[in-house]
A protein has these predicted regions:
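Membrane-interface extramembranous regions
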Residues: 1-152
Length: 152
């Protein structure tokens, strides 16, 4: 601690060191594990929202499923902080790379006379994407922001 009420790991001293980061790391990993399984087991809905400029959309969707699984498992492993950091960076980049598919999904859905999911789904999803980028970096111990206060 550096004279603040927030520990360097982002957890309140009352909650114990690292509990918040650890809990969110497990939650994010679970999210990506489930998403990865769905990308592999049921790729068609994901292929359908893949932008037309993406080559080999079916293969790309399968590769994204494998990337989600690998990132989630690397995030959870307890042995290597560098591997956890790499997973955080990889999952953050992944979230940036799939953003065009999320935008395409919103455009396709909202263009329908009766949208299936509507604005109540798509708008929060758009705002969630940068949060997923930050969360992957934070739980992967790549960044400390906003919980650190600089070098001094």
């Amino acid at each position: 601690m550096r004279g603040t009420d927030v520990a360097e790991n982002g957890a309140s001293p009352r909650m114990g060191a690292g509990r918040v980061r650890s809990a969110l790391r497990w939650l994010l990993a679970l999210f990506y594990l489930v998403a990865g399984v769905f990308h592999l087991a049921r790729p068609v809905p994901f292929v359908e929202i893949t932008p037309g400029w993406v080559p080999l959309p079916h293969e790309v969707v399968l590769a994204t499923g494998l990337a989600e699984l690998a990132g989630a498992l690397a995030l959870l492993q307890p042995w290597s902080l560098p591997l956890r950091r790499a997973a955080g960076i990889g999952l953050a980049l992944y979230a940036v790379c799939v953003f065009p598919a999320n935008i395409n999904h919103m455009i396709m859905d909202m263009a329908k006379p009766s949208p299936v999911l509507g604005w109540g789904y798509h708008v929060p999803r758009m705002f969630a994407q940068p949060v997923l980028v930050w969360l992957a970096l934070w739980v992967g111990s790549v960044i400390e922001w906003p919980f650190s206060h600089g070098s001094g």
